[in-house]
Regions:
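C-terminal engagement/docking regions of AAA+ P-loop ATPases
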Residues: 70-75, 297-467
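Conserved alpha-helical scaffold flanking the Walker A/P-loop in AAA+ ATPase domains
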Residues: 52-55, 112-139
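Walker B catalytic acidic pair
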Residues: 142-144, 154
Length: 467
Protein backbone atom coordinates (compact mmCIF):
# COMPACT_ATOMS: atom_id res chain seq x y z
CA UNK A 1 0.00 0.00 0.00
CA UNK A 2 1.38 3.39 -1.02
CA UNK A 3 1.61 6.19 1.52
CA UNK A 4 -1.15 8.78 1.75
CA UNK A 5 -0.66 11.94 -0.32
CA UNK A 6 -2.06 15.41 0.20
CA UNK A 7 -3.71 15.32 -3.23
CA UNK A 8 -5.72 12.26 -2.19
CA UNK A 9 -7.14 14.18 0.76
CA UNK A 10 -8.24 17.25 -1.23
CA UNK A 11 -12.00 17.72 -1.17
CA UNK A 12 -13.51 17.45 -4.68
CA UNK A 13 -16.55 19.67 -3.98
CA UNK A 14 -16.08 21.71 -0.80
CA UNK A 15 -14.01 24.82 -1.61
CA UNK A 16 -12.34 26.97 1.05
CA UNK A 17 -8.91 28.54 0.55
CA UNK A 18 -9.22 30.96 3.49
CA UNK A 19 -6.32 30.82 5.95
CA UNK A 20 -7.64 29.37 9.21
CA UNK A 21 -4.38 29.16 11.19
CA UNK A 22 -0.80 30.35 10.95
CA UNK A 23 2.12 28.47 12.49
CA UNK A 24 5.78 29.31 12.84
CA UNK A 25 7.97 26.47 11.65
CA UNK A 26 11.38 25.45 10.37
CA UNK A 27 11.12 23.81 6.97
CA UNK A 28 13.54 21.38 5.34
CA UNK A 29 16.45 19.39 6.72
CA UNK A 30 18.37 20.91 9.68
CA UNK A 31 21.19 23.30 8.75
CA UNK A 32 23.76 23.58 11.52
CA UNK A 33 25.85 26.70 12.05
CA UNK A 34 29.39 26.79 13.45
CA UNK A 35 28.08 26.42 16.98
CA UNK A 36 26.06 23.35 16.03
CA UNK A 37 22.72 25.16 16.28
CA UNK A 38 19.92 24.86 13.75
CA UNK A 39 20.31 27.80 11.38
CA UNK A 40 17.03 27.37 9.51
CA UNK A 41 14.94 30.56 9.67
CA UNK A 42 11.42 30.46 11.05
CA UNK A 43 8.77 30.57 8.36
CA UNK A 44 5.03 31.13 8.69
CA UNK A 45 2.89 28.24 7.48
CA UNK A 46 -0.69 28.93 6.45
CA UNK A 47 -3.26 26.14 6.77
CA UNK A 48 -6.87 26.28 5.59
CA UNK A 49 -9.92 25.00 7.41
CA UNK A 50 -9.83 21.95 5.14
CA UNK A 51 -6.25 21.31 6.29
CA UNK A 52 -7.31 21.40 9.94
CA UNK A 53 -10.14 18.95 9.15
CA UNK A 54 -7.65 16.62 7.40
CA UNK A 55 -5.39 16.78 10.46
CA UNK A 56 -8.29 16.05 12.81
CA UNK A 57 -9.27 13.06 10.67
CA UNK A 58 -5.76 11.65 10.82
CA UNK A 59 -5.80 12.18 14.60
CA UNK A 60 -9.19 10.45 14.92
CA UNK A 61 -10.81 13.45 16.64
CA UNK A 62 -14.58 13.97 16.60
CA UNK A 63 -15.78 17.15 14.89
CA UNK A 64 -18.85 19.38 15.05
CA UNK A 65 -19.52 21.96 12.31
CA UNK A 66 -21.86 24.80 13.26
CA UNK A 67 -23.17 27.69 11.16
CA UNK A 68 -26.14 29.33 9.55
CA UNK A 69 -27.56 27.65 6.46
CA UNK A 70 -25.58 27.72 3.23
CA UNK A 71 -22.05 27.71 4.68
CA UNK A 72 -21.19 24.31 3.18
CA UNK A 73 -21.00 22.22 6.35
CA UNK A 74 -23.04 19.35 4.90
CA UNK A 75 -21.01 19.44 1.68
CA UNK A 76 -17.80 19.32 3.73
CA UNK A 77 -18.97 16.32 5.76
CA UNK A 78 -20.25 14.60 2.62
CA UNK A 79 -16.84 15.00 0.96
CA UNK A 80 -15.20 13.43 4.02
CA UNK A 81 -17.63 10.50 4.05
CA UNK A 82 -17.45 9.70 0.34
CA UNK A 83 -13.98 10.84 -0.73
CA UNK A 84 -12.08 9.54 2.31
CA UNK A 85 -14.21 6.64 3.58
CA UNK A 86 -15.90 5.36 0.41
CA UNK A 87 -19.44 6.50 1.26
CA UNK A 88 -22.27 4.61 2.94
CA UNK A 89 -22.95 2.12 0.17
CA UNK A 90 -22.32 -1.58 0.70
CA UNK A 91 -18.57 -1.39 0.01
CA UNK A 92 -18.01 1.91 1.84
CA UNK A 93 -16.60 2.61 5.30
CA UNK A 94 -19.02 5.41 6.25
CA UNK A 95 -22.27 5.44 8.21
CA UNK A 96 -24.60 8.39 7.56
CA UNK A 97 -27.69 9.55 9.44
CA UNK A 98 -29.97 12.59 9.49
CA UNK A 99 -30.75 14.10 12.87
CA UNK A 100 -34.52 13.80 12.63
CA UNK A 101 -36.99 12.75 15.38
CA UNK A 102 -37.91 9.58 13.48
CA UNK A 103 -34.32 8.33 13.28
CA UNK A 104 -33.79 4.96 14.98
CA UNK A 105 -30.19 3.92 15.46
CA UNK A 106 -31.15 0.26 15.55
CA UNK A 107 -32.14 0.52 11.88
CA UNK A 108 -28.52 1.24 11.11
CA UNK A 109 -26.78 -1.37 13.23
CA UNK A 110 -29.32 -4.17 13.60
CA UNK A 111 -31.41 -6.51 11.44
CA UNK A 112 -34.18 -8.96 12.24
CA UNK A 113 -34.02 -12.53 10.94
CA UNK A 114 -37.08 -14.78 11.27
CA UNK A 115 -36.75 -18.59 11.36
CA UNK A 116 -39.56 -19.57 9.00
CA UNK A 117 -38.91 -23.31 9.41
CA UNK A 118 -39.69 -23.36 13.12
CA UNK A 119 -42.76 -21.19 12.81
CA UNK A 120 -41.72 -19.42 16.03
CA UNK A 121 -40.57 -15.87 16.57
CA UNK A 122 -38.26 -14.82 19.39
CA UNK A 123 -37.50 -11.10 19.28
CA UNK A 124 -34.24 -11.52 21.22
CA UNK A 125 -32.74 -14.24 19.02
CA UNK A 126 -34.15 -12.70 15.84
CA UNK A 127 -32.22 -9.46 16.42
CA UNK A 128 -28.76 -9.55 14.87
CA UNK A 129 -26.07 -6.93 14.75
CA UNK A 130 -24.80 -5.76 11.38
CA UNK A 131 -21.10 -6.49 11.86
CA UNK A 132 -20.17 -4.73 8.63
CA UNK A 133 -21.78 -1.51 9.90
CA UNK A 134 -20.18 -1.74 13.34
CA UNK A 135 -16.72 -2.03 11.79
CA UNK A 136 -17.04 1.11 9.69
CA UNK A 137 -14.66 3.91 10.63
CA UNK A 138 -16.85 6.98 10.01
CA UNK A 139 -20.20 8.01 11.46
CA UNK A 140 -21.77 11.29 10.30
CA UNK A 141 -24.96 12.96 11.53
CA UNK A 142 -26.36 15.83 9.47
CA UNK A 143 -28.28 18.54 11.38
CA UNK A 144 -27.93 16.74 14.67
CA UNK A 145 -29.80 19.49 16.52
CA UNK A 146 -33.02 18.46 14.73
CA UNK A 147 -33.01 15.39 16.96
CA UNK A 148 -34.81 15.88 20.31
CA UNK A 149 -33.00 15.19 23.58
CA UNK A 150 -33.87 11.47 23.90
CA UNK A 151 -32.70 10.88 20.33
CA UNK A 152 -29.49 12.81 20.98
CA UNK A 153 -28.76 10.38 23.81
CA UNK A 154 -28.46 7.63 21.21
CA UNK A 155 -25.47 9.44 19.72
CA UNK A 156 -23.50 9.55 23.01
CA UNK A 157 -22.10 6.05 22.62
CA UNK A 158 -21.39 6.57 18.91
CA UNK A 159 -19.30 9.64 19.70
CA UNK A 160 -17.39 7.46 22.19
CA UNK A 161 -16.89 4.78 19.53
CA UNK A 162 -19.32 2.32 21.17
CA UNK A 163 -22.64 0.62 20.42
CA UNK A 164 -24.67 -1.43 22.92
CA UNK A 165 -26.32 -4.61 21.61
CA UNK A 166 -28.17 -7.01 23.93
CA UNK A 167 -26.42 -5.44 26.92
CA UNK A 168 -22.95 -5.84 25.40
CA UNK A 169 -20.79 -2.84 24.50
CA UNK A 170 -19.30 -3.21 21.03
CA UNK A 171 -16.33 -1.21 19.79
CA UNK A 172 -17.04 0.72 16.61
CA UNK A 173 -14.47 1.10 13.86
CA UNK A 174 -11.12 -0.64 13.69
CA UNK A 175 -7.97 -0.63 15.83
CA UNK A 176 -9.49 1.96 18.17
CA UNK A 177 -10.28 4.37 15.32
CA UNK A 178 -13.91 5.52 15.04
CA UNK A 179 -14.55 9.06 13.76
CA UNK A 180 -17.76 10.89 14.70
CA UNK A 181 -18.75 14.00 12.76
CA UNK A 182 -21.90 16.14 12.92
CA UNK A 183 -23.38 19.39 11.61
CA UNK A 184 -25.72 21.76 13.46
CA UNK A 185 -27.24 25.23 13.38
CA UNK A 186 -25.94 26.70 16.64
CA UNK A 187 -24.56 29.90 18.15
CA UNK A 188 -27.63 31.97 17.35
CA UNK A 189 -28.44 34.70 19.86
CA UNK A 190 -32.02 34.77 18.56
CA UNK A 191 -32.54 31.43 16.84
CA UNK A 192 -34.87 31.27 13.85
CA UNK A 193 -34.62 27.56 13.04
CA UNK A 194 -37.95 25.83 13.66
CA UNK A 195 -37.89 22.17 14.60
CA UNK A 196 -34.46 22.32 16.23
CA UNK A 197 -33.41 21.46 19.78
CA UNK A 198 -30.63 22.60 22.08
CA UNK A 199 -27.69 20.21 22.03
CA UNK A 200 -26.92 18.34 25.22
CA UNK A 201 -23.71 19.56 26.91
CA UNK A 202 -22.47 15.98 27.25
CA UNK A 203 -22.80 15.54 23.49
CA UNK A 204 -21.03 18.84 22.83
CA UNK A 205 -18.16 17.72 25.07
CA UNK A 206 -17.76 14.61 22.92
CA UNK A 207 -17.05 16.81 19.92
CA UNK A 208 -13.30 17.16 20.39
CA UNK A 209 -13.23 20.01 17.87
CA UNK A 210 -15.85 22.62 17.03
CA UNK A 211 -15.70 24.63 13.81
CA UNK A 212 -17.87 27.75 13.52
CA UNK A 213 -18.21 28.16 9.75
CA UNK A 214 -19.79 31.60 10.21
CA UNK A 215 -16.43 32.86 11.50
CA UNK A 216 -14.71 35.15 8.94
CA UNK A 217 -11.52 33.04 8.93
CA UNK A 218 -13.37 29.76 8.44
CA UNK A 219 -15.75 30.64 5.61
CA UNK A 220 -14.88 30.53 1.87
CA UNK A 221 -13.30 33.61 0.32
CA UNK A 222 -15.14 35.67 -2.35
CA UNK A 223 -12.93 33.97 -4.94
CA UNK A 224 -13.99 30.57 -3.59
CA UNK A 225 -17.65 31.57 -3.82
CA UNK A 226 -17.23 32.50 -7.47
CA UNK A 227 -15.64 29.11 -8.17
CA UNK A 228 -18.56 27.40 -6.46
CA UNK A 229 -21.10 29.49 -8.39
CA UNK A 230 -19.48 28.72 -11.74
CA UNK A 231 -19.15 25.02 -10.92
CA UNK A 232 -22.75 24.16 -10.05
CA UNK A 233 -26.22 25.28 -11.09
CA UNK A 234 -28.17 23.83 -8.14
CA UNK A 235 -27.75 24.26 -4.38
CA UNK A 236 -27.91 20.56 -3.55
CA UNK A 237 -25.02 18.70 -1.94
CA UNK A 238 -22.83 16.93 -4.50
CA UNK A 239 -21.68 13.39 -3.80
CA UNK A 240 -17.93 13.03 -4.25
CA UNK A 241 -16.46 10.11 -6.22
CA UNK A 242 -16.18 7.19 -3.80
CA UNK A 243 -12.62 6.75 -2.55
CA UNK A 244 -11.55 4.56 0.36
CA UNK A 245 -8.46 5.88 2.17
CA UNK A 246 -9.14 4.06 5.44
CA UNK A 247 -6.07 1.83 5.31
CA UNK A 248 -3.76 4.81 4.82
CA UNK A 249 -5.60 6.88 7.43
CA UNK A 250 -5.25 4.09 10.01
CA UNK A 251 -1.51 3.82 9.35
CA UNK A 252 -0.96 7.54 9.92
CA UNK A 253 -3.30 7.59 12.91
CA UNK A 254 -1.14 5.00 14.68
CA UNK A 255 1.97 7.12 14.06
CA UNK A 256 0.30 10.26 15.42
CA UNK A 257 -1.05 8.53 18.53
CA UNK A 258 2.32 6.91 19.23
CA UNK A 259 4.04 10.31 19.02
CA UNK A 260 1.35 11.97 21.17
CA UNK A 261 1.86 9.41 23.96
CA UNK A 262 5.46 10.52 24.48
CA UNK A 263 6.23 12.94 27.29
CA UNK A 264 6.67 16.40 25.77
CA UNK A 265 7.96 19.00 28.26
CA UNK A 266 6.50 21.89 26.22
CA UNK A 267 3.03 20.37 26.06
CA UNK A 268 3.16 19.27 29.70
CA UNK A 269 3.80 22.87 30.76
CA UNK A 270 0.99 24.07 28.48
CA UNK A 271 -1.51 21.51 29.82
CA UNK A 272 -0.78 22.63 33.38
CA UNK A 273 -1.18 26.26 32.34
CA UNK A 274 -4.59 25.75 30.67
CA UNK A 275 -5.69 23.20 33.25
CA UNK A 276 -4.61 24.17 36.73
CA UNK A 277 -3.54 27.68 35.77
CA UNK A 278 -6.88 28.69 34.25
CA UNK A 279 -8.89 26.84 36.90
CA UNK A 280 -7.52 29.04 39.70
CA UNK A 281 -9.84 31.67 41.19
CA UNK A 282 -8.50 34.09 43.77
CA UNK A 283 -12.01 35.12 44.81
CA UNK A 284 -13.30 31.62 45.50
CA UNK A 285 -13.02 30.20 49.00
CA UNK A 286 -11.40 27.04 47.64
CA UNK A 287 -9.28 28.93 45.09
CA UNK A 288 -10.79 27.17 42.11
CA UNK A 289 -13.38 28.17 39.52
CA UNK A 290 -15.44 24.99 39.30
CA UNK A 291 -19.16 25.63 39.72
CA UNK A 292 -18.47 29.20 40.84
CA UNK A 293 -17.52 30.18 37.28
CA UNK A 294 -18.53 32.63 35.92
CA UNK A 295 -20.71 34.09 38.70
CA UNK A 296 -17.81 35.03 41.01
CA UNK A 297 -16.19 36.93 38.14
CA UNK A 298 -18.68 39.76 38.74
CA UNK A 299 -17.07 40.44 42.12
CA UNK A 300 -13.46 40.04 41.02
CA UNK A 301 -10.86 42.68 40.29
CA UNK A 302 -9.81 40.80 37.16
CA UNK A 303 -13.32 41.01 35.67
CA UNK A 304 -13.61 42.33 32.14
CA UNK A 305 -11.63 40.99 29.27
CA UNK A 306 -8.84 39.64 31.42
CA UNK A 307 -7.89 36.08 30.60
CA UNK A 308 -8.93 34.45 33.87
CA UNK A 309 -12.47 35.87 33.64
CA UNK A 310 -12.95 34.77 30.03
CA UNK A 311 -12.32 31.04 30.35
CA UNK A 312 -11.99 28.28 32.91
CA UNK A 313 -9.56 25.37 33.04
CA UNK A 314 -9.67 22.71 30.34
CA UNK A 315 -11.22 19.33 31.12
CA UNK A 316 -9.38 16.03 31.11
CA UNK A 317 -11.37 15.16 27.98
CA UNK A 318 -10.16 18.15 25.95
CA UNK A 319 -6.50 18.23 27.02
CA UNK A 320 -5.47 15.02 25.17
CA UNK A 321 -7.28 16.33 22.07
CA UNK A 322 -5.12 19.47 22.13
CA UNK A 323 -1.93 17.42 22.13
CA UNK A 324 -3.10 14.95 19.48
CA UNK A 325 -4.27 17.71 17.12
CA UNK A 326 -0.98 19.58 17.59
CA UNK A 327 0.96 16.51 16.43
CA UNK A 328 -1.49 15.93 13.58
CA UNK A 329 -1.04 19.51 12.34
CA UNK A 330 2.70 18.88 12.10
CA UNK A 331 2.13 15.68 10.13
CA UNK A 332 -0.38 17.37 7.81
CA UNK A 333 2.02 20.27 7.18
CA UNK A 334 4.73 17.82 6.08
CA UNK A 335 2.21 16.04 3.86
CA UNK A 336 1.19 19.34 2.26
CA UNK A 337 4.68 20.74 1.73
CA UNK A 338 6.36 17.46 0.88
CA UNK A 339 9.34 18.09 3.17
CA UNK A 340 10.34 18.01 6.81
CA UNK A 341 8.52 20.54 9.00
CA UNK A 342 9.22 21.39 12.64
CA UNK A 343 6.39 23.53 13.99
CA UNK A 344 7.00 25.63 17.07
CA UNK A 345 5.47 23.35 19.75
CA UNK A 346 3.81 26.16 21.68
CA UNK A 347 2.34 27.62 18.48
CA UNK A 348 0.92 24.19 17.63
CA UNK A 349 -0.81 23.67 20.98
CA UNK A 350 -2.15 27.24 21.02
CA UNK A 351 -3.80 26.78 17.63
CA UNK A 352 -5.12 23.35 18.61
CA UNK A 353 -6.54 24.94 21.77
CA UNK A 354 -8.67 27.29 19.61
CA UNK A 355 -10.76 24.38 18.36
CA UNK A 356 -10.69 21.88 21.21
CA UNK A 357 -11.72 24.01 24.20
CA UNK A 358 -14.95 25.59 23.09
CA UNK A 359 -18.19 24.50 24.75
CA UNK A 360 -18.58 24.83 28.49
CA UNK A 361 -15.26 26.60 29.10
CA UNK A 362 -15.93 30.15 27.96
CA UNK A 363 -17.65 32.68 30.21
CA UNK A 364 -21.15 32.44 28.73
CA UNK A 365 -22.25 35.76 30.25
CA UNK A 366 -19.43 37.60 28.50
CA UNK A 367 -20.04 35.64 25.28
CA UNK A 368 -23.67 36.76 25.20
CA UNK A 369 -23.25 40.35 26.36
CA UNK A 370 -20.00 41.40 24.68
CA UNK A 371 -19.67 39.05 21.70
CA UNK A 372 -23.34 38.56 20.71
CA UNK A 373 -22.91 34.77 21.10
CA UNK A 374 -19.97 34.70 18.67
CA UNK A 375 -18.12 32.09 20.68
CA UNK A 376 -15.32 31.55 18.18
CA UNK A 377 -14.54 35.28 18.11
CA UNK A 378 -14.37 35.27 21.90
CA UNK A 379 -12.24 32.13 21.78
CA UNK A 380 -9.82 33.79 19.37
CA UNK A 381 -9.41 36.81 21.64
CA UNK A 382 -8.94 34.46 24.58
CA UNK A 383 -6.20 32.60 22.72
CA UNK A 384 -4.57 35.92 21.81
CA UNK A 385 -4.40 36.81 25.51
CA UNK A 386 -3.24 33.30 26.35
CA UNK A 387 -0.44 33.60 23.78
CA UNK A 388 0.94 36.52 25.80
CA UNK A 389 1.09 34.28 28.87
CA UNK A 390 2.64 31.50 26.78
CA UNK A 391 5.35 33.90 25.59
CA UNK A 392 6.08 34.69 29.23
CA UNK A 393 6.28 30.96 29.94
CA UNK A 394 8.52 30.52 26.90
CA UNK A 395 11.25 32.62 28.55
CA UNK A 396 11.32 30.35 31.59
CA UNK A 397 10.84 26.94 29.97
CA UNK A 398 14.49 26.16 29.12
CA UNK A 399 15.53 26.48 32.76
CA UNK A 400 12.42 24.63 33.98
CA UNK A 401 13.12 21.74 31.60
CA UNK A 402 16.67 21.72 32.98
CA UNK A 403 15.20 21.35 36.47
CA UNK A 404 16.07 24.89 37.58
CA UNK A 405 13.97 27.38 39.55
CA UNK A 406 12.14 29.66 37.05
CA UNK A 407 13.74 32.95 38.05
CA UNK A 408 15.40 35.30 35.56
CA UNK A 409 17.75 38.17 36.27
CA UNK A 410 18.23 41.03 33.83
CA UNK A 411 20.93 43.69 33.73
CA UNK A 412 22.69 46.18 31.49
CA UNK A 413 26.08 45.14 30.09
CA UNK A 414 28.02 47.11 27.48
CA UNK A 415 24.89 48.92 26.38
CA UNK A 416 22.81 45.76 25.97
CA UNK A 417 20.03 44.33 28.11
CA UNK A 418 21.00 40.81 29.17
CA UNK A 419 18.67 38.13 30.56
CA UNK A 420 19.99 35.02 32.29
CA UNK A 421 18.77 32.29 34.64
CA UNK A 422 19.38 33.21 38.25
CA UNK A 423 22.12 31.17 39.89
CA UNK A 424 24.52 31.84 42.73
CA UNK A 425 27.57 32.16 40.49
CA UNK A 426 26.00 34.82 38.26
CA UNK A 427 24.64 36.81 41.21
CA UNK A 428 28.06 36.81 42.92
CA UNK A 429 29.76 37.95 39.71
CA UNK A 430 27.30 40.82 39.23
CA UNK A 431 27.62 41.92 42.85
CA UNK A 432 31.40 41.81 42.60
CA UNK A 433 31.29 43.97 39.45
CA UNK A 434 28.83 46.30 41.17
CA UNK A 435 26.24 45.73 38.42
CA UNK A 436 22.62 46.13 39.50
CA UNK A 437 20.05 43.62 38.30
CA UNK A 438 16.33 42.90 38.49
CA UNK A 439 14.62 39.60 39.23
CA UNK A 440 11.49 38.20 37.61
CA UNK A 441 9.85 34.93 38.63
CA UNK A 442 7.33 32.89 36.65
CA UNK A 443 5.06 32.28 39.62
CA UNK A 444 4.92 35.98 40.42
CA UNK A 445 4.12 36.88 36.81
CA UNK A 446 1.34 34.29 36.57
CA UNK A 447 -0.19 35.36 39.89
CA UNK A 448 -0.33 38.95 38.67
CA UNK A 449 -2.47 37.70 35.77
CA UNK A 450 -4.82 35.82 38.10
CA UNK A 451 -3.54 32.37 37.14
CA UNK A 452 -2.76 29.38 39.35
CA UNK A 453 0.85 28.39 40.06
CA UNK A 454 0.56 25.24 42.18
CA UNK A 455 1.86 23.19 39.24
CA UNK A 456 5.16 25.05 38.73
CA UNK A 457 7.28 23.44 41.48
CA UNK A 458 6.07 19.85 40.78
CA UNK A 459 6.81 20.39 37.08
CA UNK A 460 10.37 21.57 37.77
CA UNK A 461 10.90 18.70 40.20
CA UNK A 462 9.76 16.14 37.64
CA UNK A 463 11.94 17.60 34.89
CA UNK A 464 14.91 17.44 37.25
CA UNK A 465 14.18 13.76 37.97
CA UNK A 466 14.06 13.01 34.24
CA UNK A 467 17.46 14.57 33.51
Amino acid sequence: MNELTYDELKFPNYVNSNTAIRLRAKVGEPELDREGKDARPLKTLELTLSDVVYAAELAGLNMLFVSDTGRGKTQLMSDVAWHHYGGDQETGQANWADGRPSFDITDLFERTRVDLDSGKFDSDTARQVKEERVKRLFFGVDEINRAPGPKQNEFFDLADGKYTFNGKRLNLGEDGYALFMATANLNKLNGDFSGTFELDRALLNRAHLTFDLDHPNFRPTPEDEMVIEERKANPKVDLAPAQDLTGKILTINKKILTAAKQLDPYFTAFRFLVGRGLDYCDTDKYKEKGAAFPMLCNECGYTGKDLCSMIKGSSERSIPAVKTLAYALSYLAELKLGEKVEIDPLDAVLQAFRFTTYHGNLNELVAQEEYAARNQTMMDETVEKLSGVVNTLRDYLPMMIAGQDPTIISYQFQGNRVKAPKDQKTVQALNKANISFQETNLKKELKEKGLGVDWVDPYVKRMKELK
